[in-house]
């Protein structure tokens, strides 16, 4: 999808005194898909695509309105790609033309900075969508600015094809980095992780926010004097504790569609 890709990692078994009492209380939740509303709905008029028929990616000039704000850049990028399709002979789906077919890809490629385009050639970019017939943005959060860059956390829901002719939902989370170029915000890097729905229900504890804090900062570091109740607002989990060193600590996690938790700050 134009990003570096890695499977979701949950950590490896450790030799420290892992607490066997830390168990998933509701394993069924790890198998359930998302019901969140989608966010990439900025382009509901398909006439937007009319000027770009028969144009190569290097002939396209995006309207400046699409990249004037950081939020706008991310949501417009994925709005362009929402109904893009790159199904293959080995990854089939649908019953005829799907969405806007491959028309959106050269348009979306122009949301990248020139430097990112040098790092990710167009053919490689197109191949990163192989098997995908639909993309929804279901979570989007701006993170604290870094020097020269504006980062975002994102979670995507895709519909993908299989060789046996069925389609399935897949979920990815990751990070997008924007760079301001001539007063416009362009995508300078993306990295996505595929979500696994069969690991957390059976193995490890690194996917559970409360277990991460209790194990790493309590059992291992003896840093927790008093851990306060977890606060949850939607998919954002906040865990506070008072340290044995007298300091106050706060950890923020995002809960993914597969109900695993990712440490954000």
Regions found by a protein language model. Give the residues of each.
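Exposed beta-sheet edge and beta->alpha loop/turn motif
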Residues: 1-44, 145-265
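Short, low-complexity N-terminal intrinsically disordered segments enriched in polar/charged residues
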Residues: 2-98, 102, 201-206
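Core segments of small alpha/beta cavity-forming domains
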Residues: 52-131, 212-265
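Short, charged low-complexity intrinsically disordered segments located at boundaries
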Residues: 105-112, 138-143, 156-160, 207-208
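A short, amphipathic edge element
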Residues: 126-149
């Amino acid at each position: 999808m134009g990003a570096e890709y890695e499977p979701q990692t949950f950590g490896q078994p450790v030799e420290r005194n892992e607490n066997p009492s830390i168990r998933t209380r509701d394993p069924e939740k790890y198998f359930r898909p998302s019901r969140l509303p989608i966010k990439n709905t900025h382009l509901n008029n398909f006439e937007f695509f009319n000027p770009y028929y028969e144009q190569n990616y290097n002939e396209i000039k995006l309207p400046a309105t699409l990249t004037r704000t950081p939020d706008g850049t991310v949501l417009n990028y994925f709005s362009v790609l929402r109904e893009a399709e790159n199904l293959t002979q080995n990854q089939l789906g649908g019953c005829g033309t799907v969405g806007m077919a491959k028309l959106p890809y050269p348009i979306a490629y122009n949301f990248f900075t020139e430097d990112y385009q040098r790092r990710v050639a167009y053919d490689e970019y197109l191949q990163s969508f192989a098997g995908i017939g639909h993309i929804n943005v279901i979570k989007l959060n701006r993170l604290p600015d870094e020097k020269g860059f504006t980062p975002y956390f994102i979670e995507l829901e895709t519909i993908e094809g299989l060789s046996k002719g069925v389609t399935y939902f897949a979920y990815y989370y990751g990070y997008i980095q924007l760079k301001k170029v001539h007063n416009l915000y362009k995508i300078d890097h993306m990295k996505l992780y595929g979500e696994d729905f069969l690991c957390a229900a059976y193995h490890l504890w690194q996917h559970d926010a409360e277990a991460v804090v209790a194990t790493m900062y309590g059992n291992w570091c003896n840093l927790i004097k008093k851990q306060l109740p977890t606060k949850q607002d939607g998919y954002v989990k906040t865990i506070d504790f008072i340290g044995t060193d007298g300091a106050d600590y706060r950890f923020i996690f995002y809960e993914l569609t597969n109900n695993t938790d990712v440490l954000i700050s």
